[in-house]
Amino acid sequence: MAKTIQAIRGMNDCLPEISGTWQKVESVLRQVVASYGYQEIRTPIVESTDLFKRSIGEVTDIVEKEMYTFEDRNGDSLTLRPEGTASCVRAGNEHGLLYNQQQRLWYMGPMFRHERPQKGRYRQFHQFGVETYGMDGPDIDLEVILLSARFWKSFGIEQHVKLQINTLGSNEARAAYRDTLVAFLKERADQLDEDSLRRLETNPLRVLDSKNPDVQAAIADAPALIDHLDDESKAHFDTLCARLTQAGIEFEINPRLVRGLDYYNRTVFEWVTDSLGAQGTVCAGGRYDGLVEQLGGKATPAVGFAMGIERLVLLLTTLTEEGQDTSFADVYVTAMGDDAQPYAIEVSEALRNALPNIRIMMHCGGGNFKKQLKRADKTGARLALLLGSDEMQSREVGVKPLRDGQEQVTVSFDTLADKVAEMLSAK
């Protein structure tokens, strides 16, 4: 027997038992962004490696350790996208979508990072993101946070996520703060772990993001960036906080929130939960006013966020009954004997025409009624349609409820759709 080939570690199949939950999640995400007037953008999975080196930063963990990079036959260095923002900016610059324009965009698709696989963190993962361009005031920061908050309300989990926000200030203010922070950290270098010492040399703000309890204790009294802001960034942040309060959005200012990508400035935020263990961040974003120019475009203000769909599905299945419904049919059409099969096809197609939102499955492969009804039960269908030679001759259909104790009835072909709709709507 040939050896069975398995999926690559950290890259998972989405099986039928959970794909329905994915579809519902994706549908809600699409509905919410559409209600805010956002438009979809789709970009390639593979991009030039330079795109991510220039945007994310060459000394970030993503570029140094996590990207899937290879040379094609022309010798060009290509990378499977590790995130979506850089691709959106590249596409916007390339197609003239950004200069002197306002854009509200969203995307959804697979991303790739060579990380250690664990619950809620995978090497291929799916990301939903929102990106806005051409608006520099705190009002658009507020809008993207309100939009993300509406996701949680739509899923019924708003009590299980919390908003954390911070500001990184301007590039100039952050550079001055960096010097202050480096001096503080070097005095405590003997209390830092290996990863933090590396970050101290390459990206010292990321030391503040350490999850090591010993490092957290060592930097507990580190100077806060929020105390070193330029006046304009402080006013921007103060206005955002005031408007979040006015909008009824509860939040916590987290001075240790810095985000792992180099392109952020001013507002950064995360939605976090206590329900997923170590992988507590379910949505994260912020402002990146310099990235468009950094990638060859004109200076353009921008703000956005992204969320991992795997992590969101995991959260929903943890907190709610979502995903527990494993049915994949509403109506199961049985047929006794080869003579009745053409009638079963006619009935199935007529119902699909009349009730396009109802899931209708027709039995194939023969077998007696007992076998067919057993199969109907496995699909989770609420109704079974019973068809034999007698029903075919009389142009009637037996309708057998499988779940709620209603009486079996026989109806004419012409009234079948109305009867099915009525019985499915009954509680």
From Swiss-Prot:
Keywords: Aminoacyl-tRNA synthetase, ATP-binding, Cytoplasm, Ligase, Nucleotide-binding, Protein biosynthesis. Belongs to the class-II aminoacyl-tRNA synthetase family. It holds the Pfam family HGTP_anticodon. It catalyses: tRNA(His) + L-histidine + ATP = L-histidyl-tRNA(His) + AMP + diphosphate + H(+). One of its GO terms (molecular function) is ATP binding. It is an enzyme of class 6 (ligase). This is Histidine--tRNA ligase. It comes from the Bacteria. It is found in: Cytoplasm. GO terms for cellular component: cytoplasm. The keyword Cytoplasm applies. The keyword Glycoprotein does not apply. Its EC number is 6.1.1.21. Homodimer. GO terms for biological process: histidyl-tRNA aminoacylation. PROSITE patterns: AA_TRNA_LIGASE_II. InterPro entries: aa-tRNA-synth_II, aa-tRNA-synth_II/BPL/LPL, Anticodon-bd, Anticodon-bd_dom_sf, His-tRNA-ligase, HisRS-like_core, HisRS/HisZ, HisRS_anticodon.
